[in-house]
Amino acid sequence: MTNKPAKRPVNGVLLLDKPEGLSSNTALQKARRLFHAEKAGHTGVLDPLATGLLPVCFGEAAKFAQYLLDADKAYTATLKLGEASSTGDAEGEIIAAARADISLAEFQTACQALTGNIRQVPPMFSALKHEGKPLYEYARKGIVIERKPRDITVYSIDIAEFDAPKAVISVRCSKGTYIRTLSEGIAKHIGTFAHLTALRRTETAGFTIAQSHTLEALANLNETERDGLLLPCDVLVSHFPQTVLNDYAVHMLQCGQRPRFEEDLPSDTPVRVYTENGRFVGLAEYQKEICRMKALRLMNTAASSA
C-alpha cells in the first residue's frame, strides 16, 4: 500500500481557476491535497455551474480571508432569454417561457436600469444560511424561505455579445451580488424571462483570471513549482495602509499589549504591520485618541518568521 504524503504547514494564497461541475469546496479540497496542506479555505462560493477565479487561502492566509470576501467582483455571464429556470441557471428545469425576440435596444435599456445602487433578494438556490442550513436545501424540498432584500451596487453591465435569445454580459459589482438574480431582473424589465447558461468570475479584489491556475496545470507540477505559485498572505489586505514597527513594539503586539505609536494614519481602518526587515506581522488598529496600536489579526509567530 502506498503511504499518503504527510500533510504540511502551507501558508499563502492560490488563485485557482475553478472548473465547471465542481462545487467550490470540492475544488478547494482537490487543491489542498495537491499541496498536502494542513488547512485551507476559500473566499466566496462559486456555484458548480460557474467557473473562474476562486482564491484559496492556505494556513495563516485564512485569517485574512474575510477581507477578500468583502471585495468587489467581476463576472462574464451568458444568458438565455425567454425561459425561466427553477434554479435561475441551466441546472434547473424550465418552468416558464415568454418572448425571446428581444431587440438590442431593449436589452441595453434593461441593463442600464439595473446598473447602480439597487436592492436584490437573494435566490432560494444559494448558500445563504437559514437556521443553520443553506437555502438550497430548503429549495430542493420545495420550501420557500422569506429573504430580505439586500443593498448591492452594480458598477457596470457591458454587453459583450447579443444574438437573441443569447446574450453575454460583463458585470462589475459589489459583494453579495447574485448574477442569476440580476439576469432575471434584466429580463423582467423587458417583460420576459432569462436564466444563466454559463458564468465565469473574472476578477475579485484586483486579482484577475489571467493570474489563476487550473487543477490540471497544478497536478503537472512538482511541489517546489506549486509552492512558487503561492502569493504571500498579505496580498489579501494590500488595500489597507501599512506601517513599520520596531522589534520591541512587534513583541508587545504579539503578547496582547498595546505599544505606543504616533503616526498620521486613519483610526477607523485596519493597518498592515511589518517588521523593520519587511516581515508581515498582521493587522492592527490604530487607536489615535490614545496613540496606541491594538492587534486585530496576527500571523502565527512561527509562520511569520518563516
UniProtKB/Swiss-Prot annotation:
Keyword terms: Isomerase, tRNA processing
The reaction(s) this protein catalyses: uridine(55) in tRNA = pseudouridine(55) in tRNA
Residue intervals passing through the bilayer: none
SUPFAM superfamilies (UniProt xref): Pseudouridine synthase (SSF55120), PUA domain-like (SSF88697)
Active site: residue positions: 47
Keyword presence, Translocase: no
GO terms, molecular function: RNA binding; tRNA pseudouridine(55) synthase activity
Keyword Cell cycle recorded: no
The protein's Enzyme Commission number: 5.4.99.25
GO biological process: mRNA pseudouridine synthesis; tRNA pseudouridine synthesis
Family as reported in the entry's similarity comment: Belongs to the pseudouridine synthase TruB family. Type 1 subfamily.
Described function: Responsible for synthesis of pseudouridine from uracil-55 in the psi GC loop of transfer RNAs.
PANTHER family tied to this protein: PSEUDOURIDYLATE SYNTHASE TRUB1 (PTHR13767:SF2), TRNA-PSEUDOURIDINE SYNTHASE (PTHR13767)
Name by which UniProt lists this protein: tRNA pseudouridine synthase B
Organism of this sequence: Neisseria gonorrhoeae (strain ATCC 700825 / FA 1090)
Gene: truB
